[in-house]
Curated annotation (Swiss-Prot):
PANTHER family: L-SERYL-TRNA(SEC) SELENIUM TRANSFERASE. This is Uncharacterized protein mlr3804. The keyword Endoplasmic reticulum does not apply. One of its GO terms (molecular function) is L-seryl-tRNA(Sec) selenium transferase activity.
Length: 383
């Protein structure tokens, strides 16, 4: 196992987060204790509700499981028999979920699979680049259990209905709205804007253990929680993750956000200065696409650098320690550096490596490689 420098972000494939000390302590403290899990989740509900403005909440294994549980809950309500019969036997249940086509993303797995695991049918609304109000309105019928709205940099960032518009249409037809806000900093805004249930990550910006946070209307949260007696049994969360996430939520309240922001800005400026004047390289500090309070460095790579964006990203990852960049748009000739997950001294290492790789006389063999979606390495695990 090799240590890496993460300038990609809070990615599950890279370990999700650097857990804050408060969460580590809470996890260690509860690890050797017996607890009644429903009571622990009741305590978590109080913390989640206070910080999000929801009526109730609970902790689950991750956001993907939270989506499945919330959708299943919208289908079954509190019918324990219906809960046991999912996902195959939906009977007379409402079992369709409306989602804008531009929101059907892959976050490591396709989001529509999280819907289907609940036993629900995915009903796409609109086109990849445009959703009109009538697309959603006409997709809703007597079988619709919920509308799912995704807030993420992965979604199409133009032409989609706003959350307010989506909620207005769904609510006019008596359909609850579930929001996937895994990476979002705003713990209160989505419920305030009309969502009925919101799902957050406990391990991304909160820096807790791998977990999901479900919050919102009490009846829907209760129905989602009861899925632990059904499809969510395979997604169960441990006491350590519940305690750690509660601690991370409370630590978030007290965190020096202004100080963290200053450190992130210093790293971005350091990297931008390191790239100044290098042939074929243009660096710009840009805001987060979903309006989280953070910036990233976007690095444009042209042939004059004797690299492609994919080739430069590969060269940084090939060093020691590997530097893993945010490369989800690398085929467009650029990638990003995210400053949010650095240990002390790592920003300087990144700056030095960037300069060294780009000023070296020779280039690696794959410097000009094209971006490819190659899954062959995945299929070789664990070799």
């Amino acid at each position: 196992m090799r240590p890496i420098i993460n300038v990609s972000g809070t990615m599950t494939a890279l370990g999700a987060s650097i857990i804050v000390p408060e969460a580590i302590s809470a996890m260690a403290e509860i690890a050797s204790q017996w607890v009644e899990m429903d009571d622990l989740q009741r305590a978590a509900s109080t913390v989640v509700a206070r910080l999000t403005g929801g009526e109730a909440g609970f902790i689950t294994a991750c956001c993907a499981s939270g989506i499945t549980m919330a959708i299943a809950g919208a289908m079954t309500g509190t019918s324990l028999l219906a809960i046991e019969r999912l996902p195959d036997d939906t009977g007379d249940l409402k079992s369709e979920v409306v989602i804008q086509l531009g929101h059907i993303v892959n976050y490591g797995a396709p989001i529509d699979q999280s819907i289907r695991v609940a036993g629900a049918k995915v009903v796409p609304a609109g086109t990849v680049s445009v959703t009109q109000d009538y697309h959603v309105r006409e997709a809703i019928n007597e079988r619709t259990a919920a509308g799912l709205y995704v807030v993420a940099h992965h979604t199409v960032q133009y032409g989609m209905l706003s959350l307010e518009e989506f909620c207005e249409i769904c609510h006019a037809k008596g359909v609850p709205v579930i929001v996937d806000a895994a990476s979002e900093y705003d713990l209160r805004g989505f419920l305030a804007r009309g969502a009925d249930v919101v799902i957050y990550s406990g391990h991304k910006f909160l820096s807790g253990p791998t977990s999901g946070i479900v919050t919102g209307r009490k009846d829907l949260v209760r129905a989602a929680y009861l899925q632990n007696r059904g499809v969510a049994r395979a997604m169960k969360v441990g006491k350590e993750s519940i305690a750690g996430t509660m601690a991370a939520l409370e630590a978030w309240e007290k965190r020096d956000h202004a100080g963290i922001r200053r450190r992130e800005e210093a790293a971005l400026n350091l990297w931008k200065d390191a790239l100044q004047g290098l042939p074929g390289i243009l660096a710009k500090i840009i805001p987060d696409p979903t309006a989280n309070p953070l910036d990233r460095l976007q690095i444009f790579v042209s042939p004059e650098s004797r690299f492609t964006a994919a080739g430069l990203a590969s060269a940084l990852a090939a060093g020691s320690p590997p530097i893993i960049v945010r490369n989800h748009e690398v085929e467009r000739g650029h990638f990003f550096l995210d400053p949010c997950n650095l240990h002390p001294g790592e920003a300087e290492i990144v700056a030095e490596r960037l300069r060294a790789v780009l000023t070296a006389k020779d280039r690696p063999a794959d410097a000009m490689k094209a971006a490819r979606k190659d899954s062959s390495g995945v299929l070789k695990w664990p070799d």
